From Swiss-Prot:
One of the primary rRNA binding proteins, this protein initially binds near the 5'-end of the 23S rRNA. It is important during the early stages of 50S assembly. It makes multiple contacts with different domains of the 23S rRNA in the assembled 50S subunit and ribosome. The keyword Ligase does not apply. Residues 43-73 are annotated as: Disordered. InterPro entries: Ribosomal_uL4, Ribosomal_uL4-like, Ribosomal_uL4_dom_sf. This is Large ribosomal subunit protein uL4. NCBIfam families: rplD_bact (TIGR03953). The keyword Zinc does not apply. One of its GO terms (biological process) is translation. It comes from Colwellia psychrerythraea (strain 34H / ATCC BAA-681).
Length: 201
């Protein structure tokens, strides 16, 4: 199959297996959820009654006061007590096989092509790290909410986009399912397309 180039005449020959496969919604959902779960910090921590300091002394004698019996001030019903089912640090990451991950990426790319949200260009760069220059280039391509994917990290491009809302720059090695589905359009260079094909082949 072929992808038309936005900034030049002609088209780019690409693999049907990478850019023309059927959309697998269940797979994409599973991989996106797993990826988002892996980004969770998981460092929350609360103390149980055995971990809260103090509470060793019996607050008042067992009988004769008229009050309910109590043996500690650190039980969960006390204001300064521990938490009944205390949250503990945990790892939220989920295992995703390489084949599943690559399949999800290919499925997303194919759907972007079908929805005409994948914009392929021969080359995309800025001469100096100036936001104004990048904004002008994106305006010429009628792009606002966009993920820019290049074969390798372009420092000028990265610095130019750093202060722009809903614009991100990634190299091929840094793309992930969440970033691909999180933007209205994906602007990708021809070199990056070939690099992705090589990885997903």
């Amino acid at each position: 199959m072929e992808l038309s180039l936005k900034d030049a005449s002609g088209a780019l020959e690409v693999s049907e297996a990478t850019f023309g496969r059927e959309f697998n919604e269940a797979l994409v959902h599973q991989v996106v959820v797993a990826y988002a779960a892996g980004a969770r910090q998981g460092t929350r921590a609360q103390k149980t009654r055995s971990e809260v300091s103090g509470g060793g002394a019996k607050p008042w004698r067992q009988k004769g006061t008229g009050r309910a019996r109590a043996g500690t001030t650190r039980g969960p019903i006390w204001r300064t007590g521990g938490v009944t089912f205390a949250a503990k640090p945990q790892d939220h990451s989920q295992k995703v096989n390489r084949k599943m991950y690559r399949g999800a990426i290919a499925s997303i790319l194919s759907e972007l092509v079908r929805q005409e949200r994948l914009v392929v260009v021969e080359n995309f760069s800025v001469e100096t790290p100036k936001t104004k220059e990048l904004v002008a280039k994106l305006k010429g391509l009628e792009l606002k909410d966009v993920l820019i994917v290049t074969k390798e990290v372009d420092e000028n491009l990265f610095l130019s986009a750093r202060n722009l809302y809903k614009v991100d720059v990634r190299d091929v090695a840094a793309i992930d399912p969440v970033s691909l589905v999180g933007f209205e359009k994906v602007l990708i260079t021809a070199d990056a397309v070939k690099e992705i094909e090589g990885i997903l082949a």
